[in-house]
Amino acid sequence: MSEGASQGGAYRAGIQVTLKPGVFDPQGAAVAGALGTLGFAGVADVRVGRYVELRLTAPDEATARATVERMCETLLANLVIERYAFNLTQEAG
């Protein structure tokens, strides 16, 4: 999940939030139907999620990672029906 050194500074997090398996995805169903209507055959089980990218400063990578975890669990994902994953990279300079 991570790249870069453990020094402090600026970090960029790319966060992907998706519905948990088994949770009905009405947007995904609509997209699958539209793709079929447009002639794209063989498309099934479309899932629609969201992507959040943010920049943060932290004294070290572990603190940055813990902060992003708290952001996801507090605001960015509804943990009852969604799951999340993120990549964290330290910005150069």
Predicted regions and their residues:
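Long, contiguous binding/interaction regions
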Residues: 1-93
